[in-house]
Structures are given as C-alpha cells and as structure tokens.
From Swiss-Prot:
It is a multi-pass membrane protein. It comes from Mycobacterium tuberculosis (strain ATCC 25618 / H37Rv). It comes from the Bacteria. The keyword Metal-binding does not apply. This is ESX-1 secretion system protein EccE1. It is found in: Cell inner membrane. InterPro entries: EccE_dom (IPR050051), T7SS_EccE (IPR021368). The lineage of its organism: Bacteria, Bacillati, Actinomycetota, Actinomycetes, Mycobacteriales. Belongs to the EccE family.
Length: 462
C-alpha cells in the first residue's frame, strides 16, 4: 500500500514559510493566546512541506480549480498534419501542432519472430528500446527537443467469444505479455526553446518545421544504427487510432469514454508492472529530455468503472492533462518492449511461459497436430485475431467466434497467418515441443494444456 503522505522541499515555499513564521509568532506573543502564533507557524511549515498523494495542500486547491474550469470544455484537438520534405529526396515527415508544441512521430518497427519469455513476472525479449539511448541521441543531435515514447495496445482482444477470452485471461494470468502493442516516439518542439536552432533554417514556423523534420530523420537514422528499426511517420493516423479512448467527459478520478472508462495512473514499477494490469486497452507514455529524469504515466481503459491495480496510484484531478501528456510523474530509465508479445505457444523446461508475435509479418504456419491447431487458433482468437476456418469446422467456429471461408487463416490488424502452405512468404513450424522460425530454427518448448481447452478440440470434425 502506497503511503499517501510525503515531504517535498522547495526554495520558494521555504522562503515564504520562513518569512511568515516570525510575524505570526510576534503578533500573538503579548497576548494570552501566545500559542496561536506557534500553531500558525507550524501550520505554515506543514502546508509548505507535507504532500498528500504527491501534492501540497496548495497544489490540491490549484488542481480542483483547474479541473472545475476545464471539465465542461471539450479537449483541445491537434491541428491538421502537414507533410514536409527533408534534404533527402522522397523522405517525408508529418508535423502538426499539439497544444503549444510542434510534434512529429517516429514509428518503431517490431523485429519479426522475436519471442518473449516471462521469468518471475518479468518479460525478457530482444525487441527493446532503452530510454537512456533516446536521451543520449537527443543530447547529441537536438538538445532543445524532448521525446515521448508512447506504447499502445491490449493484453487480450475482444473479437472472440467471451468464454474464449475469459479462458485465455486465466491462462496468461498477470504475465506482462500484451497480444498487441505498437510503439512510437513523439518528438516535441517548443517554439521558444528551439528558436535559435529553427532560425538557422528559416524564419518563423517554417524554420521550426524544418528543424523538427530534420531532427526526426536524424533520430530515426541513429536508432537504426543501434539496431532499432525506426521510420518517420508520414501521417498521424495510426498513432491517433491506437491512442484514441473515445473521450466524452473528464471526471475527478477517470475519463468517461463512449463505451468505456479510462483512468490515468503513476506506476513506478516500469513496463512489467504496466502491462501486467488487466485492461481492455493500455497506453504508456515515457517522456525523455536531455538532463532531466524520465517521466511517465499509464492509462488503463476498462468496460467497467476502474479499480486501482496493485502498484498503481491514481492521478486524481489530472486525468485529462495525463492523457495529453501534461501531467507526468518522475520515474527512471528503463528498457521498453517495442512490439507485441503475441500468443502463448508453450513454456521452457523451467516452466517459464513463451510468447511469439504473429501480427507483424505474413507467414505460413505449419501446425503439428490437432491439439496444437486447437490451442493456437483458440488463443489467437482470444488475442484479437479474426479467425477463418473451413466449412467442416462449423461447430468449432461457433464456439470460438470464428468465420467460415475457403481459406484457413488468422487475420491480425497488420498481418495474416495462413494455416497451411502459401507461396511467397516465410514458413513457421509449431509443434508440441518446438517452434521453428526463419530467425530461430529450433526453439525448444513444452506444451501448456489447461483442461478447459479440451472442449474446443472435441468440437473438431472427426
């Protein structure tokens, strides 16, 4: 349980308290209520130094006032994006105004066939971005910019039958293994801070846009040289779609959406804590700026009114600012997973769950037997894929919420997994004891077989 009380020292509050304390004591010194002056001075020290859930009393008053002012207003929308060319022919980067900042987006491309292994509640994968690397690149190439590393996704999907989704949630438990996740770096340029750098390229907004575009291109190139595939965004469509929560109204402790609720939290535990919390949609934001400690916030969207997960702290009175990246909490540098963890395919000999993503590249999947076929299709449906099976699987399709078609496949938002031979694409083999990919020829695994999944195998045609 987090202790709601804390201490915070600042020069301004200390000077104000030290200036007011002596007059308060002197004013009551010659009266019969001499103790009142000491009490007022002590109260001033408490107001200046003691915090309650991260804010002083004055901070809570300001938060309530700000919330009352904005709660009736719709959120400010971003400007229409403009695409500007850099000095490299054909390399376009979209920029737009977001509040007082001009922003550009860099999408991080997941590394195909990268498994995630969960060991003692921690996700181990090669597909990672070090926030310290981003700060280093900013310091070298554009020290007057700041970057938001934004990841959005979900642990389980909502396209399958409810029983299938519920069963898969029980199987994966609290593993920090989202079925779907995409990551972007949003570069933010403050016109005042970047004035000198922008004026070297052009006057006014044109110079600022050119500086931001050139910086985004340079950061993407440097990330690629460090093994992180990054592409400058030509539009904000994918980013906006992934981070949309259907905002309707801000409340004191949550945001009411069109058909769900979203709550903003501080969670110092890092991505393993953030992605282990049950939610229909998760958005994480880590802000990095040269010479400053990273700041972060987490937004969890649920169908019902949210309950604060263990290790999280609700940002009362600051829900909309957290959504817009204006209310972040100090954190530390960490390794952020880039792509999806994917579907549970088995476990190691030490009983550590193994997940494999299938949503980033088209493949032809060869499944070893009926049980492996059943487990993969059921779990893929629970992970948010649209499953299509043949007409002979009608009963099976009805149980899991699949479609009937001539081609057996699993359709992800950005890729398709064909359950059989398919020309022109990579081939993956999944057996009860091994998974083979173009990257890992033979990755030993053991089957994970919860008894509840057997009912779906019984629905297969004999």
């Amino acid at each position: 349980m987090r202790n709601p009380l804390g201490l915070r020292f600042s020069t301004g509050h200390a000077l104000l308290a030290s200036a007011l304390a002596p007059p308060c004591i002197i004013a009551f010194l010659e009266t019969r209520y001499w103790w009142a002056g000491i009490a007022l001075a002590s109260l001033g020290v408490i107001v200046a130094t003691v915090t309650f859930y991260g804010r002083r009393i004055t901070g809570w008053v300001a938060a309530v006032y700000a919330w009352l002012r904005r709660r009736r207003r719709p959120p400010d929308s971003s400007s229409e994006p403009v695409v500007g060319a850099t000095v490299k022919p054909g390399d376009h980067v979209a920029v737009r105004w977001q509040g007082e900042f001009l922003v550009a987006v860099i999408e991080l491309i997941p590394r195909p066939f990268t498994p995630t292994v969960i060991v003692d509640g921690q996700a181990h994968t090669d597909d990672m971005l070090d926030t310290g690397l981003v700060e280093e690149l900013l310091s070298v190439h554009c020290p007057d910019l700041e970057a938001d590393i934004v990841s959005a996704g979900y642990r389980v999907g909502n396209t399958a039958a409810p029983d299938v989704v519920s069963l898969y949630q029980q199987v994966i438990g609290t593993d920090p293994a989202p079925a779907n996740r995409r990551t972007w770096i949003v570069l933010r340029a403050d016109p005042e801070r970047t004035r000198k750098s922008a004026q070297r390229r052009d006057e006014g907004v044109a110079g600022l846009a050119r500086y931001l575009v050139a910086s985004a291109t340079r950061i993407a190139d440097r990330l690629a040289s460090h093994g992180v595939d990054a592409v400058c965004g030509r539009s904000f469509d994918d980013y906006d779609h992934a981070t949309d929560i259907g905002f309707v109204r801000e409340k004191w402790s949550m945001i009411k959406g069109r058909d769900a609720y979203t709550a903003a939290y501080a969670a110092p535990g890092g991505p393993d804590v953030w992605w282990s919390a049950r939610a229909d949609h998760t958005i994480t934001r880590v802000r990095v700026a040269p010479g400053m400690a990273p700041q972060s916030t987490v937004l969890l969207t649920t169908a019902d009114k949210p309950k604060t997960p263990r290790g999280f702290a609700r940002l009362f009175g600051g829900q909309r600012p957290a959504l817009q990246g204006q209310h972040l909490v100090a954190n530390r540098h960490c390794q952020l997973p880039i792509g999806s963890a994917g579907v549970l395919v088995g476990e190691t000999v030490n009983r550590c769950p193994v997940y494999m993503p299938f949503d980033d590249v088209d493949i032809a999947l060869n499944l070893g037997d009926a049980q492996t076929f059943t487990q993969f299709v059921v779990r893929a449906a629970a992970a948010g894929a649209m499953v299509t099976v043949g007409p002979q699987f009608e009963e099976f399709a009805r149980l899991i919420g699949a479609h009937i078609g001539q081609e057996v496949k699993v359709a992800w938002p950005n890729a398709t997994t064909y359950l059989g031979p398919h020309p022109g694409i990579d081939r993956v083999i999944l057996r009860h004891n091994v998974i083979g990919t173009p990257r890992h020829r033979q990755l030993p695994i053991r089957r994970v077989s919860p008894p509840e999944e057997s009912r779906y195998q019984m629905a297969l045609p004999k």
